[in-house]
A protein has these predicted regions:
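Walker B catalytic acidic pair
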Residues: 192
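Active-site-proximal or metal-binding-adjacent scaffold patches in catalytic folds
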Residues: 1-187, 196-224
């Protein structure tokens, strides 16, 4: 469903949620609203109109940013791993692999591989790194907070660092986290675990986060 927000088009997606959620998506500032299944369209529109000025400010910020150069996954490019920059070196071989060594990341790719194929292999390698690190850190945070998720998975999300389904007690972590400092992973884990107890982002939520992570604001800035 599409609605108009004072001249701004917005996509409305109905979900099994309790509260409205409005997101301005990079890189072009598209607007998406997640809404409860039975909430009237008039209520959604009224909510969106109250956010019109904020939406315009966010869109202006996004459109004024220089576009990031798209990686081609070729030798000489710089790629991030846990907040550290590595120089990519690509070689051809019969078996795909990614091997870190010093300040270099060696990507062994099939002969005549495409950019999309190399990107896909790198994404899976990032996923492996995230699973290994989160597999160690998530249980530690569960023990510290007393908040336990039923299951957790990884997903290559480009607009969110993590999500939590509090009813199913399931947490999703973005594969993109493997590019950021590991302190950011801790923040996102704690953030999503806290949603098992507090579903919104109100005062109680941030107080719960700060109880275990006083520097959460600094960590969140690293994710911008």
């Amino acid at each position: 469903m599409q609605i108009d927000i004072d001249g701004i088009p917005a996509e409305v997606v109905r979900k099994r949620i309790r509260t409205l959620r409005l997101t301005v998506l990079p890189p072009d500032g598209r607007v998406r609203i997640s809404a409860p299944m039975l909430l009237p369209k008039s209520a959604i529109t009224a909510f969106a109109l109250s956010k019109a000025d904020w939406i315009r400010k966010q869109q202006q910020k996004m459109r004024s940013r220089p576009l990031a150069k798209e990686l081609q996954y070729v030798s000489g490019e710089t790629v991030p791993v846990w907040g550290r920059e590595y120089t990519l070196y690509v070689t051809e071989g019969s078996r795909w692999s990614v091997t870190p060594g010093g300040d270099m990341l060696l990507l062994t790719a099939a002969e005549n591989s495409t950019r999309e194929q190399r990107e896909a292999r790198m994404t899976e390698w990032y996923r492996e790194q995230l699973k290994a690190e989160a597999g160690k850190r998530l249980p530690e945070w569960e023990k510290r907070t007393g908040l336990y998720c039923g299951s957790w998975q990884t997903k290559n999300m480009k607009t969110r660092w993590g999500t939590c389904n509090s009813n199913a007690r399931r947490i999703w972590l973005s594969v993109q986290l493997a590019k950021k400092p590991v302190e950011c992973l801790d923040y996102v884990i704690l953030h999503e675990l806290t949603h098992l107890k507090v579903r919104n982002h109100g005062k109680d939520f941030w107080q719960a986060v700060e109880r275990y992570m006083p520097d959460w604001r600094e960590r969140r800035k690293l994710l911008k």
